[in-house]
Amino acid sequence: MEVKASARFVRIAPRKVRVVIDLVRGKSVNEALALLKFIPKRASEPVAKVIASAAANAEHNFSLNKDNLYIAKAYVDQGPTLKRYHPRQRGQAFPILKRTSHITVVVKEKEAK
């Protein structure tokens, strides 16, 4: 049973979120949440929220045990970019691109041996 959760339009660049997502992919939900508490990256908070949401969805909607869940898929897609301009010398303007991310996490129940 695959259970999915996503956070859209997170105001962090996808490149920065992917660093954090790569660390937790394939780990158990409890292990990933414990790991994310100690990662000194701004992206670790929204990633932890999405993982916790996916685990809560699995518990509430499908009556799965949170301890048996692992992160089967975790990926980040680029959202819309907010374009801003920074005024420069002689009437010039340099663009500032404020990038957004769509974070998606899919959790599965571990197979019983």
From Swiss-Prot:
Q: Does the keyword Cytoplasm apply?
A: no
UniProt record, GO biological process: translation
Q: Which GO terms describe its molecular function?
A: rRNA binding; structural constituent of ribosome
Gene3D superfamilies, A to Z: Ribosomal protein L22/L17 (3.90.470.10)
**Per its UniProt record, what InterPro entries does this chain match?**
Ribosomal_uL22, Ribosomal_uL22_bac/chlpt-type, Ribosomal_uL22_bac/org-type, Ribosomal_uL22_sf
Respond yes or no to whether keyword Phosphoprotein is given for this record: no
User: What's the family?
Assistant: Belongs to the universal ribosomal protein uL22 family.
Assembly state and interactors?
Part of the 50S ribosomal subunit.
Q: Can you name this protein?
A: Large ribosomal subunit protein uL22
Annotated source species: Symbiobacterium thermophilum (strain DSM 24528 / JCM 14929 / IAM 14863 / T)
Lineage of producing organism: Bacteria, Bacillati, Bacillota, Clostridia, Eubacteriales
